[in-house]
From Swiss-Prot:
Pathway: Carbohydrate biosynthesis; gluconeogenesis. Homotetramer. Phosphoenolpyruvate stabilizes the homotetramer. It is found in: Cytoplasm. This is Fructose-1,6-bisphosphatase class 1. It catalyses: beta-D-fructose 1,6-bisphosphate + H2O = beta-D-fructose 6-phosphate + phosphate. GO terms for biological process: fructose 1,6-bisphosphate metabolic process; fructose 6-phosphate metabolic process; fructose metabolic process; gluconeogenesis. Coiled coil: none annotated. Citrate binds at residues 3-5, 30, 187. InterPro entries: FBPase_C_dom, FBPase_class-1, FBPase_N, FBPtase, Fructose_bisphosphatase_AS. Its main location: cytoplasm. The keyword Kinase does not apply. The keyword Mitochondrion does not apply.
Length: 332
């Protein structure tokens, strides 16, 4: 049985130029995930369920666990002295770590994706993304360090808190998964070099918003529901409402996750930096594809910290089908 720490160090030795800083950074994220796991499991016994009464920069009501997870991850990253700053879905602006100007990395994160599901005991997750800073080492980081396209990511991953807690990550050399053993306090390797199955058979979308979707997406949903044995249709509809949980299931079983634009969110709802980019990096490393319906997610140059985007991610052939329908059936 190989632990996450052992696996990361083993992979580090494959790179002659490795300094160990990225290894230490991933270790900090691992620690934060353990703390969040512990408190999610007793969320109903302590006062961290429900809304906090505050709103984030997007005007969304923050859950108490959102804020808790944000603070724990931020503290774990700052304590290691290897991160120059962070950007978080729960922070209005970037957070510059004083005294860490020498650090080479910045971290972007969604501390608790799907947190509204906590009250009903549904799986939630943590998403993280790591970049090398572009401003000179030795100076405080600026927004420029965070507004990089996804193809510049050094590492990305997520933690899914479900029937078991699992950490999945990539450094650009495949996707690897580790299950948390609470009796030992360690993440243990359970799947190495994960890949999407050759053919997907599940589509994940909130069909309650069907009337608000673009024409191309409506046509694709009907395509998924039609019977065609040659393409293994109709597909199965599965939607949890937590990006991490839906993506993880589709990675294992094969499928596509869709979050298109609507009239109320014409640019889409998911955040490019905190959700789309890291999941797109993971998807491509697992043989899948991620798109906003027109272009590759990882090639989009971000303009603002909390920029939103339409998001389609999963098996490559399924994402390509969505893109085709969007091209062929544009909105009037």
């Amino acid at each position: 049985m190989k632990t996450l720490g052992e696996f990361i160090v083993e992979k580090q030795h494959e790179f002659s130029h490795a300094t160990g800083e990225l290894t230490a950074l991933l270790s900090a994220i691992k620690l934060g995930a353990k703390i969040i796991h512990r408190d999610i499991n007793k969320a109903g016994l302590v006062d961290i369920l429900g809304a906090s009464g505050a709103e984030n920069v997007q005007g969304e009501v923050q859950q108490k666990l959102d804020l808790f997870a944000n603070e724990k991850l931020k503290a774990a990253l700052k304590a290691r002295d290897i991160v120059a700053g962070i950007a978080s879905e729960e922070e209005d602006e970037i957070v510059v770590f004083e005294g860490c100007e020498h650090a080479k990395y910045v971290v972007l994160m969604d501390p608790l994706d799907g947190s509204s599901n906590i009250d009903v005991n549904v799986s939630v997750g943590t998403i993280f993304s790591i970049y090398r800073r572009v401003t000179p080492v030795g100076t405080p980081v600026t927004e420029e360090d965070f507004l990089q396209p996804g193809n510049k990511q050094v590492a990305a991953g997520y933690v899914v808190y479900g029937s078991s807690t699992m950490l999945v990550y990539t450094t650009g050399c495949g996707v690897h998964a580790f299950t948390y053993d609470p009796s030992l306090g360690v993440f243990c390797l359970c799947q190495e070099r994960m890949r999407f199955p050759e053919k997907g058979k599940t589509y994940s979308i909130n069909e309650g918003n069907y009337i608000k979707f673009p024409n191309g997406v409506k046509k694709y949903i009907k395509f998924c529901q039609e019977e065609d044995k040659s393409t293994n249709r109709p597909y199965t509809s599965r939607y949890i409402g937590s990006l991490v949980a839906d993506f993880h299931r589709n990675l294992l079983k094969g499928g596509i996750y869709l979050y298109p634009s609507t009239a109320s969110h014409p640019d889409g709802k998911l955040r490019l930096l905190y959700e789309c980019n890291p999941m797109a990096f993971l998807a491509e490393q697992a043989g899948g594809k991620a798109s906003d319906g027109k272009e590759r997610i990882l090639d989009i140059i971000p303009e603002t910290l909390h920029q939103r985007r339409s998001f389609f991610v999963g098996n490559d052939h399924m994402v390509e089908d969505v893109e085709r329908f969007i091209r062929e059936f544009p909105d009037a």
